Structure formats: C-alpha cells, structure tokens
C-alpha cells in the first residue's frame, strides 16, 4: 500500500514539474528517415549535417524526421518568419498600410497652413507616383483647399540604429519610399532629406506653394491632459471635456491606402529580397509595442511564434533577412510555421474556403507568395513567379511552393509539396557545413529528396 501511495506521489510530482512557457512534450515516437530519404542524405559532402521534418497536413502524420529539434543557421528561410509576422500584424491580405498629410487642428479648412506633416505606417511600399504615393497625397491636399504651406514636416518616429549593425548595414526609417530599393539612403539624415525633397516637389506640382525648403521633424504626439479642477470648497471636479485648439491632434487633409500586403510579401519572398525583408521587419518596430527597436521587432516575431505553437528551444532571431549567421531555427519550428499558415490561412482578396480548398485553388496568401518550383523563368532579379526556384525541379511535374536559403556553408529549403496521394506535405530541410561546402550539390540533394517525398507520399 505504501509503495502504491509513493508511486502516486511521484507521478503527481512529475506532473507538477512539466516544462514552462508552452514547451512541447512529445510522448509519441516519431519515425526516422525512410530508406529512400536515407539514400539521398547519404550523399551529403563530408562535414555537412542535415535536419529534416516532413508532415502530412491533411492527416497530421509525421512522415520523416532527422534531427528535427537541432538548431541550424537557416539563411533566408528566416524570411518565412518575417512574412508570417507581418501578414498577421496587418490582419491578412485584406489589410493595408496607410499614409496621410495632416495640418494643425486650428488651421483645418484654411488655404494657408503653417506646416503640413507626412505620417505613415513605416512600410516600404509608399511611392512617389501611383495610387499609394506622395503625388496622390499632394493632389488630395490641393482638392481639400490647401494652397500655401510654411514648412513640410515628417513624422520620422526614430528607429533604433541597430539595423545599421546587421549584415545588410543600412538604417531603417519610419518613412520610406519604394524607389529607394535601387539606391537606399545610407543614413537616416539622407532619408529625411530625400523624402522631404520628393514631397515638396509633388506639392508644388499639385499647385501648393511651400515657403521653406528646410524639412522639419514632427513633434511626437502627446495626449492632452486637462488641468485639475476644484469647486469653491476645494473638492475635485471632473475634467473639462473641452480641449483647446492648440492641444488637439493634427487633422488629416489627405490619406492613401496601400495595396494588399500579399503583394509586397511576394516581392520579398520570391526573389529573396534582403532589403525588403529588413524593411518589413522594421514595420513591426514602428507599430505600438515594437518600441522603435530591432529587439522590439524581433520580440514581436517571437510572440507570434509562441501564439502558433512553435517550440522556441534552439530558436534565435537576429534579423529579418537571414543574412546574419547568428540566426538559428529548427526544422520543427519551420514546419510548425508552415502548418499554421496552412491551418489558419489568410485568403487572397476575393478568395474563400477551407484550408485544403484554398491550397488547391491557389487562394492562400502566404503560400502563394512563395517561390514556385520549375516555372522555367530565367530573369536576373528572380522576380518572376518562380523566384529563386524557377530553374529548380524543372520538368519534375511537381507542385512545390517553398523558400530557399543560402549562405556560405548553408543551404535550406522549406515549404509545401503535393504528394502522389494529393495530400499537401509541409517540409523543412536545413543543411549546415563548412563554408566551402558545394552549395549546388546541397541544392541538388534537396531537390532529389523533395521528389522522393512526393513519390512516396
């Protein structure tokens, strides 16, 4: 009887010591590699190790594993985390970024204003011309009756200089222009000058005169706090609801809305654009909770990963592009992200349906932003539908949508393939080795493994 009581006590104690913070406890034995998969990976060059995880998204079965919880340098597959976090933060593909021009509340309706302030969402898609542009803002301000402006100001909420210390080596600013992709500003001061000059030019083009060529910085918004009031007996009274005009928030005279975030995510993921990836990560710093810092943006990514059930043991995030060799991901972390984007899809505009239907009909915004293998395009910028996978798996007849990753000694592939059963499979293949490891050989083995998976399952 005592032994039975002791056993019960030990079991209860063990339960009380379960891992904290949402750590995953796996009680089922997962399979290793099948013979065909082992045959492929047996051809890895000396010194190269691989982590593999493959899951059937319809049956939830784990199909193949090798070191799924080991941490690897992920290279550009980290962009899957960046894209997922931004898509979630924007509310899916129907969300948007916005920009507006504001004037002091006391000057609303006047033709002459002391200053005009540009405020934005921190995204990289605002352009000089087009629907979501400085030109459209200037034309709206003119239509609103603005004719003379004393000074143009920019709401350049400061972002941490830590981005300049990442391998990309460029500062991130709260207001950016799409045209900077070709020649991005080297400093925050250069960004301020170039953006301000472009806005002044568009205002003048629209018929609005600007007195000062000097670009100002918008004062940070501070909520009005009414003074305390008391009655003639010294007892506190409710605050006066009337806010003096000078203390009221500036009012908008023009606003524009971006296209679907799905478009810029595709423009980042398909060609594996490092600058766009860091710009998109910076939007998470710009939003409340990001604190204007790289660390704040990465913390928001980790928070999203926790929400979708990613086991964060071994995971380390250092940037948004994957250029940093300080990043670490596991195959399990990547497959959990892929599974979450399949199970909880963000439909493209005009698309509806359950996860399987959206996958089949090309309606899942995240999955459709990925490179598609074997499209055959041969474009130098990798900006076609196939992106960095356009020339891989040519003629294989497979439906593969996945993200590549490459650094010296690092090659990775993570995404989706439709198996012969018709089931969608989520897979992650991470390979790390010496910096002189033959990357083309690693890619060829990844492609061979994906073909084996599709044929077997």
Q: Language-model features: where?
A:
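Secretory targeting and sorting signals
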Residues: 1-20
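Active-site SXXK
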Residues: 60, 74-93, 198-199, 268, ...
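Short, well-structured active-site flanking segments
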Residues: 88-106, 212-217, 366
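Active-site-adjacent helix/loop patches that line small-molecule binding or acyl-intermediate pockets
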Residues: 99-103, 111-205, 257-300
């Amino acid at each position: 009887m005592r032994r039975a009581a002791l056993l019960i006590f030990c079991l209860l104690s063990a339960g009380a010591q379960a891992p904290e913070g949402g750590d995953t406890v796996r009680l089922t034995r997962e399979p290793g590699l099948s013979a065909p998969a082992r045959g492929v990976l047996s051809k890895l060059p000396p010194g190269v190790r691989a982590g593999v995880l493959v899951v059937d998204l319809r049956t939830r079965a784990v199909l193949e594993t090798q070191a799924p919880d080991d941490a690897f340098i992920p290279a550009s597959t980290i962009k899957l985390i960046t894209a997922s976090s931004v898509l979630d933060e924007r509310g899916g593909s129907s969300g948007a970024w916005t920009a507006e021009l504001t004037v002091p509340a006391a000057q609303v309706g006047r033709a002459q204003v002391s200053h005009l302030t540009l405020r934005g969402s921190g995204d990289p898609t605002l352009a000089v011309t087009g629907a979501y542009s400085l030109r459209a803002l200037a034309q709206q301000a003119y239509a609103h009756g603005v004719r003379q402006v004393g000074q143009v100001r920019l709401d350049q909420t400061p972002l941490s200089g830590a981005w300049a210390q990442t391998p990309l080596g460029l500062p991130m600013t709260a207001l950016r222009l799409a045209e900077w992709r070709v020649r991005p500003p080297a400093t925050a001061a250069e960004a301020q000058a170039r953006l301000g000059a472009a806005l002044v030019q568009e205002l003048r083009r629209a018929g609005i005169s600007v007195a000062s060529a000097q670009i100002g910085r918008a004062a940070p918004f501070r909520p009005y706090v009414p003074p305390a009031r008391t009655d003639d007996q010294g007892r506190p009274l409710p605050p006066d609801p009337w806010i003096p005009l000078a203390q009221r928030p500036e009012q908008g005279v023009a606003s524009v809305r971006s296209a679907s975030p799905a478009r810029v995510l595709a423009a980042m993921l398909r060609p594996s654009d490092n600058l766009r990836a860091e710009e998109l990560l910076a939007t998470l710093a710009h939003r409340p909770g990001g604190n204007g810092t790289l660390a704040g943006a990465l913390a928001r990514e980790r928070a999203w990963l926790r929400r979708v059930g990613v086991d964060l043991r071994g995971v380390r995030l250092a940037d948004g592009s994957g250029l940093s060799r300080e990043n670490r991901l596991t195959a399990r972390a990547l497959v959990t992200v892929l599974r979450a984007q399949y199970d909880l899809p963000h439909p493209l505009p005009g698309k509806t349906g359950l996860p399987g239907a959206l996958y089949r009909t090309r309606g899942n915004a995240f999955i459709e932003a990925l490179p598609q293998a074997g499209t055959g395009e041969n474009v130098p910028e990798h900006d076609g539908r196939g992106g960095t996978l356009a020339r891989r798996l040519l003629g294989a007849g497979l439906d593969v949508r996945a993200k590549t990753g490459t650094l010296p000694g690092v090659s990775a592939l993570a995404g989706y393939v439709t198996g012969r059963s018709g089931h969608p499979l989520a897979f992650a293949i991470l390979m790390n080795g010496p910096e002189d490891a033959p990357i083309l050989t690693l890619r060829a083995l990844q492609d061979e493994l994906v073909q084996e998976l599709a044929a077997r399952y």
